[in-house]
Curated annotation (Swiss-Prot):
Pfam short name (any one): NADHdh
Name of this chain's protein: NAD(P)H-quinone oxidoreductase subunit 1
Organism: Gloeobacter violaceus (strain ATCC 29082 / PCC 7421)
Source domain of life: Bacteria
Family membership: Belongs to the complex I subunit 1 family.
Length: 407
């Protein structure tokens, strides 16, 4: 099923009301970014509340409880607080670069949401190079972080900016290679096509999700995405014990809020991309269309289309929430790594493994096309399970302490 062109649908709806076609298309232009801005802002508020609550549960405390029902609008209150705080620019800072830094960090994140499908036919822009667009746009944000660190005229901020740039470059390559393996299997760069490729087994589409075909790529993507979003244990650019607050040490007010917003917007974006690439996007464990066909319900039924759209949106959000929870869990269970360990992990381990995974995927796709079956694509799952089993078998167990002899 092809995605709906929301732009043309919007223009046709207004044209039916007597609005000129050119005016209707002009009215559509700002709407996608407005929708994204509102959606991401609400998502960030929910993510901040969820992280504070889950963090409180892990530490056996309550978390926010005062502002709103159960502290649900604590994030919005913090945003208003930052909005009205004084905007200070250090005397010796470069005012132009200091101001542009936060904007260059946050703007590419919003553009990336344009190609994320939230449901079947619910994507603002289904361009044929969607995944390539996300990777290309995401590479702009480190420039803003480096610019902010340099313009602050602060040694800690500069070191934070340099760390952010080095970390981003180190992990963009393994992340891109893990995504490229998915692209090879689906033969498309479109995010919608990648999701639809994971629905090829009808009622058993759960087993066609890419997580079963690309377990190695999935682990590489998770680690790389965590590093790209600068979340613990990879929060080296703003390590409080070393760099105060990294490249946003000198920022206050709304400029600081933009950095804060970009961190959680990046986390949500990475979670959505992971759900689209590896967990079937809007696909439920049992797809609704084949299930409805068993009961004689046609896919063109308006009620079914509404239910299918709502289920798709809910499933996408739930899958993304699962990845956000994993990121929060990693923050409170794993210690922060050193900068040399971070770079070694990216260049000496993830990069070779991602290259191996890409070459293996290419060979299996060729074999699958030759044999006219998708069974060879599940070989990485067997390899991954075998490696996990070997690693667990070789794990050193502490020697038992000798029991003291009784007198």
């Amino acid at each position: 099923m092809e995605g709906i062109d929301l732009g043309n649908a919007f223009a046709q709806s207004l044209s039916g009301l007597g609005v000129p076609a050119d005016v209707a298309r002009a009215l559509w232009l700002p709407l996608p970014m407005i929708v994204i801005l509102l959606t991401v802002t609400v998502g960030v508020i929910a993510a901040v509340w969820g992280e504070r609550k889950w963090s409180g549960m892990m530490q056996q405390r309550m978390g926010p409880t005062i502002i709103g029902l159960g502290g649900s609008i604590q994030g919005a209150a913090d945003g208003v607080k930052l909005l009205v705080k004084e905007d200070i620019i250090p005397v010796k800072a470069d005012p132009w670069l200091f101001t542009l830094g936060p904007a260059i960090v946050i703007i590419p994140v919003f553009f990336s949401y344009l190609v994320i499908p939230f449901g079947q036919g619910l994507v603002l822009s289904d361009i044929t190079i969607g995944i390539f667009f996300i990777i290309a746009v995401a590479s702009i944000s480190p420039i803003g972080a480096l610019m902010a660190g340099y313009a602050s005229n602060n040694k800690y901020a500069l070191l934070g900016g340099l760390r952010a740039a080095a970390q981003s470059i180190s992990y963009e390559i393994p992340l891109a290679l893990s995504v490229l393996a998915i692209v090879m299997m689906s033969s498309s760069l479109s995010t919608v096509d990648i999701v639809e490729q994971q629905e090829t087994l009808g009622l058993f589409s759960f087993f066609s999700w890419n997580i079963w075909r690309q377990p190695i790529g999935f682990v590489i993507f998770l680690i790389s995405a965590l590093a790209e979003t600068e979340r613990a244990p990879f929060d080296l650019p703003e390590a409080e014990s070393e760099l105060v607050a990294g490249h946003h040490t000198e920022y206050t007010g709304m400029k600081f809020a933009l950095f804060y917003l970009s961190e959680y917007a990046n986390l949500i974006l990475a979670s959505l991309i992971a759900s689209v690439l590896f967990l079937g996007g809007w696909s439920f464990i049992v797809p609704l269309e084949p299930l409805a066909a068993l009961f004689g319900i046609e896919a063109s039924n308006p009620i079914f289309q509404v239910v299918n759209a709502l289920v798709g949106i809910s499933v996408t959000i739930l899958k993304a929430t699962f990845f956000v929870f994993l990121a929060i869990l990693a923050r409170w269970t794993l210690p922060r790594v050193r900068i040399d360990q971070l770079l070694d992990l990216g260049w000496k381990f993830l990069l070779p493994v991602s290259l191996f995974n890409l070459l293996l995927t290419a060979a299996l796709v060729l074999l699958s096309n030759t044999l006219k079956t998708t069974l060879p694509l599940y070989l990485p799952l067997i390899i991954f399970v075998g490696l996990v089993f070997v690693a667990m078998s070789l794990q050193k167990r502490p020697a038992a302490k000798p029991t003291a002899a009784r007198a």
